[in-house]
């Protein structure tokens, strides 16, 4: 058993069932998970929780900005945070994401997302 703290993942998703599924998959993989329902709420969470190590966000959300814009803002404020962006409606190009950001198309397997976050945060076996 590892003594290192669990990686905290912020999941940003406005669809409750998708949010619950993503959170459950990440929790099952050993991550601590918190949620936000839009970009503005995500930025509040990011400010409240300096221990957040990864953000997994949907692209299409209500509010002032979408998930790609959120990814850029998060990277500006916290370049140490791993960023994954997801969508089933559009394909996000690498050039649209901040440095190091990744795109995962919906539908996705929760285990795949958990493995990717583990690799990118250096906690491949959370």
What do the predicted segments below correspond to?
Residues 35-54:
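Acidic, metal-coordinating helix/loop segments flanking the phosphotransfer/catalytic sites
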Residues 16-34:
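Two-component/phosphorelay signaling modules centered on CheY-like receiver
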Residues 38, 65-70:
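Acidic catalytic/metal-coordinating carboxylates
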Residues 86-87:
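Hydrophobic/aromatic residues positioned on beta-strands within the core alpha/beta folds
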Residues 58-59:
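Active-site residues of response regulator receiver
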């Amino acid at each position: 058993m590892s003594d290192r703290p669990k990686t905290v993942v912020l999941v940003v998703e406005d669809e409750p069932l998708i949010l619950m599924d993503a959170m459950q998959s990440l929790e099952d993989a050993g991550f601590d998970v918190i949620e936000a329902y839009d970009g503005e709420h995500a930025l509040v969470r990011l400010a409240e929780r300096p221990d957040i190590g990864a953000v997994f966000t949907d692209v299409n959300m209500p509010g002032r900005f979408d998930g790609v814009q959120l990814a850029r803002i998060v990277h500006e404020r916290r370049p140490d945070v791993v960023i994954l962006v997801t969508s089933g409606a559009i394909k996000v190009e690498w050039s649209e994401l901040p440095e190091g950001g990744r795109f995962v198309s919906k539908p996705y397997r929760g285990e795949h997302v958990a493995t990717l976050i583990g690799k990118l945060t250096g906690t491949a076996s959370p």
